[in-house]
Amino acid sequence: MKDKLHWLAMHGVIRGIAAIGIRRGDLQARLIADPAVATDPVPFYDEVRSHGALVRNRANYLTVDHRLAHDLLRSDDFRVVSFGENLPPPLRWLERRTRGDQLHPLREPSLLAVEPPDHTRYRKTVSAVFTSRAVSALRDLVEQTAINLLDRFAEQPGIVDVVGRYCSQLPIVVISEILGVPEHDRPRVLEFGELAAPSLDIGIPWRQYLRVQQGIRGFDCWLEGHLQQLRHAPGDDLMSQLIQIAESGDNETQLDETELRAIAGLVLVAGFETTVNLLGNGIRMLLDTPEHLATLRQHPELWPNTVEEILRLDSPVQLTARVACRDVEVAGVRIKRGEVVVIYLAAANRDPAVFPDPHRFDIERPNAGRHLAFSTGRHFCLGAALARAEGEVGLRTFFDRFPDVRAAGAGSRRDTRVLRGWSTLPVTLGPARSMVSP
């Protein structure tokens, strides 16, 4: 009963309100529940843009303007929104009284849901272990893992689902290395990551909600035991180092048990699904543009910029939100304290004022790196360098190994709104080129 009431407060009633709003043409309602927007959001980007830089909806504001999005993300007049904070008051009351004690990536004490001074403390602690040297070592791991995974493909030629067999397998190895997950537990962590992905959405169906809760609770229970194991037998993984710093450091780096669990959970949710989506989106885009693959074979130095363009054109994270800390004027509009602005990152990344011919995939686009796929300001993604490395190495290695790979069907998109990617992507591999391990 408690789960049902929580679903009604967080999702069920919102689904009903959104269905009515869609018939009335409300843009926010369409963003939440319109199947056409989930299938192909690009026309919706342009429709919202036609209404101006800042669009008023029934419940909040919405922007697709790159400059405004950039400024809002960096503004001290706005803060991050905790999951469910912008629900109508009666639903917010019910949601708070029926939620469980499991952690959520968009609720305190997650890095995504706190502001200074806690945010500064968390970020300083994580940065102490997530160094450029650590990222460099993980890049080597990505390359070797990619080669190992593709070796298995070469042994079983034919049609394969590249998302299930490659795009999801590569980041789970990296995440497991960060969290110190033993090999026998990695399939469970993969399952937790896949189940938790829709947890960022509002208005999800009841059955999907149950699967999400199963994933979050399962991960929470597993993580409690895993952290205890790392305390008793620490390894050379980043999570063991983080535990040591967090529990023996000064007041600026100390973390309690709940905060440690929140960071580990964020690594899973933010580091897994987004990278799966980056790889899947990139493979699909490059399969659809063989002329770009030909250019990359002649000019492999273009791979880093190609990844930036993939991030810009098909952003793994579609949107975020900020709430006004005080009454403030934005784009000529007076926003009251407590009002929310939904920032449509994916649409801002196609703003024609910043990116000429914004819907075109151009691997040589000179300003591709100006995208907001990793946000900006104090909440800029801590794992951006690693995500870029996984994208570049994962895509380059895949297409180098299978130069004749072709799409073998339409594939299917993930049923999520905040995150965007492929759930299946069948390909015909073709002959494999031999590769030498680094």
Curated annotation (Swiss-Prot):
Binding site for heme: 381
Gene3D superfamilies assigned to the protein according to its UniProt record, in alphabetical order: Cytochrome P450
Domain of life: Bacteria
Gene Ontology biological process: cholesterol catabolic process
Signal sequence extent: none
Cofactor(s) annotated in UniProt: heme
Organism expressing this protein natively: Mycobacterium bovis (strain ATCC BAA-935 / AF2122/97)
Name recorded for this polypeptide: Putative cytochrome P450 140
